[in-house]
Amino acid sequence: MIKEIQGLRAIAIIMVLVVHGLVIVPPNWQDYVIKLQRLFFTPTGVEIFFVLAGYFLIYSLERFLKESAEKGIGKIETLLMFLVKKFKRLAPNVYFWASIIFIFGLLSKNQYPWQDSIIETKKFLSTIMFLRNFTETMDVSWFGVYWAVSLELQVFILFSIIYVFLGKRVSICLSLFFIFLMTFFRFGGADYVYLFRFDSILYGVIIFYLLQHVSQSKLKEIFRVSIFWKTIISLSLVIILSGVLRVFSEYPNLNISISAMIASIMVLLAISGNGYFYIDLKYINKSIDWIASRSYSIYCSHMFSWFLVKEVYSYFSFTEGCGSFILGIVIMAIFSEISYRYIENYLK
């Protein structure tokens, strides 16, 4: 794995944690966080995940098809094997943490933010069916974070089917078509476009094919700059990506497209291997690697970790503050480590 890809994964999950941070930050910090989020709103960290997902989707799919062809395996069997492999990668974490949230919600006796048992059951079922993005619009709940995993699997299935049976050219043309279309029109309506922003994944596909015509050494040479400029460029891109949704808030279709473009530039710079998004210093690099390698487990478990801390504090009538914030981070780290070691790779 390219070190800088790990760096991008770490940046992406930190951006997601920041946007959800109001759940766990001490009450006396919340006004400052709200003011900060009026300009810097970081759900766009998901765009980095999506662009990377698209890039590695087509990378792994082409390699998988080539290996299967050499073994004389048919298209349908190859497709099924590929999709099952992807499902095994995503499912264990989703099923485990969604089940924990479901049980916890039922035991909470319908106290906010938990919904009544019927709604909770609907949310749980849509989550384990990987259709969460189609139900978030009806009732908000703590299953909401799974919309992105659902969308990713949906796109993987559809894109893989199109690629296997209609070929590379059709897949590229359709990718470019939807990238263009979704600059002006998106599914889900004005309030829920974020639930169907699959064009970010398609940007990753296009990057893969563009780089087929450029050698790694040439790519590195093109983007080679001094440490000073690497620092300026990388920080600027993170800041711009964090501010796009607010700056272009009146254009809910365009702002997501701009976010995807910026995330694509970041992925391109990372693939060049010039050190834009990775600090290779002792302890810092280990921290980056830990966060990146566990980013999926962190994504699936962080909300439950934080709500568990809040429920415990509420039950014992403790006052939330710096202590609850630190405890929330520690519990999240512990749950993420357990999830990474014993759940995420369970079916591999």
Where are these regions (language model features)?
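Membrane-interface helix-loop-helix regions
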Residues: 75-77, 90-151, 184-185, 259-272
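Aromatic-anchored segments of alpha-helical transmembrane domains
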Residues: 14-22, 103, 177-187, 235-246, ...
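Alpha-helical transmembrane segments of multi-pass integral membrane proteins
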Residues: 16, 201, 206, 229-345
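Solvent-exposed interhelical
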Residues: 153-180, 209-230
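Transmembrane alpha-helical segments and their boundary/interface "anchor" motifs
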Residues: 43-46, 62-108, 117-126, 154-156, ...
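Functionally critical transmembrane alpha-helices in membrane proteins and complexes, commonly lining
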Residues: 3-66, 91-94, 131, 200-201, ...
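Interfacial loop-to-helix transition and helix-capping segments at the boundaries
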Residues: 2-3, 34-46, 139-151, 186-203, ...
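Structural signal for the C-terminal ends of transmembrane alpha-helices
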Residues: 57-66, 104-108, 162-168, 206-216, ...
